[in-house]
């Protein structure tokens, strides 16, 4: 099978490791444009809590798929895949390199693997039965059920990714064929994945400092303004940094406790992000916090990859 003609670079990793800065640098060095791959930066009026890149930080580099949805509207991976695919085509047709930057792994993998989305949902009874079994027996047991029925699929799906484990089990029941034997769509793009990480203690310190900076920059006021028009149970308001402040604004919690929760949830999320990218995406890892000079090695890596046929 020939490789897809259009090539894209993805910059992935946990929160607070410098993905946005690297995206700008690569775009400047490689005639690129940045496409957002963060599930919450697509929302308007959610700037501080999502660490959305500012116009000044863009340094003139075009950025796409930021501020494209109202916070009252639910967004989905299917909508993202459609919008991102169209934007990649537009950028590539301009002879520019599409550079996707973000930490929402499933959004990015939907593009990398050309995952089929928006199809017919499995019957509720099957899904509920496996969800009950998961709640009763745990994720290790659930994954073992998949491993017994479809070892190839189990090798590709982490036990912690219970949603996809259940999906694989459902498909097997629905079709009578193993999930791994289902016809897979051909990738639309050839993809190089660059991952950023750093020492865990350093990462957690950076996360804590970032949350403090967000609070000083006016995150509380941003959340308060959103709540004037956006329900607290809206999808957008489930973002870390937003949902934790709602109880304080409703007079139900102390501010210091809410901020501590933002830090805790952000650290836990960073750990989950790293687990996902390590298990689900073939990634070239770099630590630009400890070795900022390695950004030039990343440029060289991308240049060599672009020359491959």
Swiss-Prot record:
ATP binds at residues 13-20. Substrate binds at residues 15-20. One of its GO terms (biological process) is tRNA modification. The record marks 104, 127 as: Interaction with substrate tRNA. Keywords: ATP-binding, Magnesium, Nucleotide-binding, Transferase, tRNA processing. One of its GO terms (molecular function) is tRNA dimethylallyltransferase activity. Its cofactor is Mg(2+). The keyword Ubl conjugation does not apply. Its EC number is 2.5.1.75. It catalyses: adenosine(37) in tRNA + dimethylallyl diphosphate = N(6)-dimethylallyladenosine(37) in tRNA + diphosphate. It is an enzyme of class 2 (transferase). Monomer. Catalyzes the transfer of a dimethylallyl group onto the adenine at position 37 in tRNAs that read codons beginning with uridine, leading to the formation of N6-(dimethylallyl)adenosine (i(6)A). Belongs to the IPP transferase family. PANTHER family: TRNA DIMETHYLALLYLTRANSFERASE (PTHR11088:SF60). This is tRNA dimethylallyltransferase. It comes from Lacticaseibacillus paracasei (strain ATCC 334 / BCRC 17002 / CCUG 31169 / CIP 107868 / KCTC 3260 / NRRL B-441). The gene is miaA.
């Amino acid at each position: 099978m020939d490789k897809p003609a259009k090539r894209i670079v993805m910059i992935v990793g946990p929160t607070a490791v410098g993905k946005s800065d690297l995206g700008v640098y690569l775009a400047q060095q490689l005639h690129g444009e940045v496409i957002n791959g963060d599930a919450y930066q697509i929302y308007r009026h959610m700037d501080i809590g999502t660490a959305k890149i500012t116009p000044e930080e863009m340094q003139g580099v075009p950025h796409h798929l930021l501020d494209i949805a109202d916070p009252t509207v639910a967004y989905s991976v299917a909508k993202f895949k459609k919008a991102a695919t169209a934007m990649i085509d537009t950028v590539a047709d301009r002879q520019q390199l599409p550079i996707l930057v973000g930490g929402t792994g499933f959004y990015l993998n939907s593009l990398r693997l050309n995952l089929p989305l928006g199809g017919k949902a499995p019957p509720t009874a099957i899904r509920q039965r496996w969800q009950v079994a998961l709640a009763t027996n745990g994720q290790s047991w659930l994954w073992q059920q998949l491993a017994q029925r479809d070892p190839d699929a189990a090798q590709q799906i982490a036990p912690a990714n219970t949603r996809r484990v259940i999906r694989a089990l459902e498909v097997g029941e629905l079709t009578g064929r193993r999930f791994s034997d289902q016809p897979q769509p051909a990738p639309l793009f050839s993809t190089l994945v660059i991952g950023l990480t750093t020492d865990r203690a350093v990462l957690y310190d950076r996360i804590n400092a970032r949350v403090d900076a967000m609070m000083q920059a006016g995150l509380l006021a941003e959340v308060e303004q959103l709540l004037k028009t956006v329900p607290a149970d809206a999808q957008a308001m489930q973002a870390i940094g937003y949902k934790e402040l709602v109880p304080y604004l409703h007079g139900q919690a102390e501010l210091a406790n809410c901020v501590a929760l933002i830090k805790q949830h952000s650290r836990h999320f960073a750990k989950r992000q790293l687990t996902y990218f390590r298990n689900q995406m073939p990634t070239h890892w770099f630590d630009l916090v400890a070795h900022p000079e390695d950004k030039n090695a990343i440029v060289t890596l991308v240049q060599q990859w672009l020359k491959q046929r």
